[in-house]
Amino acid sequence: MAEMDLIHEQGAALPVAARSDVLVVGGGPAGQAAAIAARRMGVSVTLVERYPYLGGLASGGMVLVLDDMTNGSEITVTGICMEMIERMQRIDAAVYPPPEDRRQSEEMWRKWARWGVHDFRSTSKPLPIVMAAAFDPDGWKRIANDMITEAGVNLRLHSWFSKAIVDDGRIKGVICETKEGRQALFGDVVIDTSGDLDVAASAGAKFAEGGYMVTTVFRLGGVETETAERFRWGEPAAYAKRDKEAKSIIGGSWDMWWLKTPLPGVVWCNCPHMTGLDALKVADQTKADFEGRKRIYALVDYARANLPGFEKCFVVDVAPQLGVRQTRLLEGRYVVTKDDVNDRIWFADTVARGRDYYTPYRSLLPKDIEGLIVAGRHYSATESAQKLSREIPPCMSMGQSAGVAAALAIDGGLSLASIDPRAICAHVREQGGDPGDSPSANATAPKMAAE
């Protein structure tokens, strides 16, 4: 890449848009959970988000299944995540299998497979049906707005994070770009839920850079899903051939390239996947968006001509946010490893959990920046560990615990590092969450690695 031309920007006084006890940067699932949890603890909270909606990759990225939240028959992610699911279900914006259907059988597989509510990490066939929820992205936005409003969070949308404000090793707030110009926002504790570790990186925290495929998720309307499923089960050989051809056109997808949604005739497609792109670079993001749409339109043409049930399909929308899975990863007080996840290591300072793995409090804390805690897919983990632990429910579990930790620091006048993880867990449980402080039967012996 050619060296960029440089200009020198003249400094200017900035208006202060907000001062609060806790400042949360990033209104995705982890940020929502963090803001709500902290506010429920009684502290003042400001939440800033660059888009005109809440939900991040859940809503704007249209990752429309909440999974990785069960350990066998045990539901391991509850709290604010489960509140979202249940409230969306009450307005017909979420669908999940009832307890009696959460089992392994050919009957349940045929009934639920196209909802994506199966244990995708299982090696047995058919894949077991588990507690997971398919949802509508606008349903998410609606319930998120309700919950943020009910909690009393000061929400500032259309605010694009630009720079951390740091003084003598302590973060004080952030600068955001807005239509009104640059604005400063201050918080006694700052929570980075940006997804790309934007705040922590700007503040000077140590991090690694990972990389994983990106996706331009889209939805199709006008699909006769029952006809499509009859073709799948009634003509397996013909289905397999055409499904393979469709996947070849899209150029990268999971086993099932389309799944049902709560909206009749509307399916969502978690594809096409594209590799070798850096989601922190504008040129690569632009390339992904253009290439993704090109593949989508080619797939639609093929589906109309060749796939029963898709004869009249059309593109409802392409996700406004690129599906980014991994960029910067914090190098915090503890770095979670792939073995930690695969071996189900339980930590003495566990404060959050996913399917059958556990998140230590230290993995949310930068080593060298005071007043800052992180939550979400950019937490302190190796690339390989993060790929196994980055789903939305565990990120919400991290967010809820980070919000509680921030509030405890404010109330006690304490540093984040000095907060007792047991106190965090106790308050998360009071809010209906499962912070993982009581390990499941298949967890591995306690671990408290050195910082």
Predicted features, each with a name:
Residues 1-22:
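Extreme N-terminal leader/targeting segments of oxidoreductases
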Residues 18-20, 180-189:
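Core beta-strand elements of the Rossmann-like FAD/NAD(P) dinucleotide-binding domain
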Residues 22-46:
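N-terminal Rossmann-like FAD-binding beta1-loop-alpha1 element of flavoenzymes
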Residues 25, 185-195:
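Short hydrophobic core segments
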Residues 165-184:
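Conserved beta-strand-loop-beta-strand element in the redox core of flavoprotein oxidoreductases
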Residues 192-205:
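Flavin (primarily FAD) binding-site architecture
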